[in-house]
Amino acid sequence: MKIAAVYEAVTRSIIAELEQGAAPWVKPWKGGNCIGILPANAITGRCYSGINIPILWHAADVHGYPTNAWLTFKQALDKGAHVKKGEKGTQIVFTKRVTVEKGDTDEEKQISMLRAFAVFNVAQVDGFDAPDAAAAPPPPAGAVIEFAAATGADIRHGGDKAFFVPSVDFIVLPDPESFESVEYYHATKLHELVHWSGHKTRLDRDLNNRFGTNAYAAEELVAELGAAFLCAHLGVQGQLRHAGYIDSWLSLLKKDERAIFTAASKASAAADYLRAFSEQEEEAAE
């Protein structure tokens, strides 16, 4: 499948979900066997990233796959297994760095190019010992608290709104008891931490956009996806803040088929950036 067709197919699928009032990156970590599980390659164990996360979550949800482990046709063959007759793969993408000549000069530069390929859920494969399909064990009660503390973010409580203030570099959250559940509080905290990661002293995303603009909607999409990725990583079953942004996301995606890919890439970078703080603490403690 050509990459332009992948852009179109993925964006069309997400638009269809949003028009039904649902966000396709929410349900897989909110219920079912995929709770707390990021999609990963069944052979290498490596988690997928960027747009591939919601693509594979959505595919697992739609088809009712009991696990979020995937592999390529060749990987199945190499293990002496085979894809079941009639099964169709799920198209995902990877970024390949290629070197090209710069104009008429001898200078070279590297550019990123997307390539599409198909993967199959292990439930679509015969002769392969699938990993345990059980849901991930619940995280320690204080996992999100420890995760947030490790970042060093200035988080304050008060009022009835959640937001990040780039000019003074702090997060404001309502008191925990103001939320419908502790999970909703944690999911909201993770959403704001993704915004925090975009500060000019960190990942330097543009955070000074007016409400109602496409740029504002794009940053909210980054925060929403990043929070979903982190909720899966930490095993949080909560409620994301997508409802109020659906109309603006629809407008954004209908104008730009690449917008969801860009947002997912930035969300993955933000999640990786935030996870690194906890990983550094763990390494220091060893």
Regions from the language model: what does each represent?
Residues 1-286:
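N-terminal accessory/interface modules of nucleic-acid-binding and processing proteins
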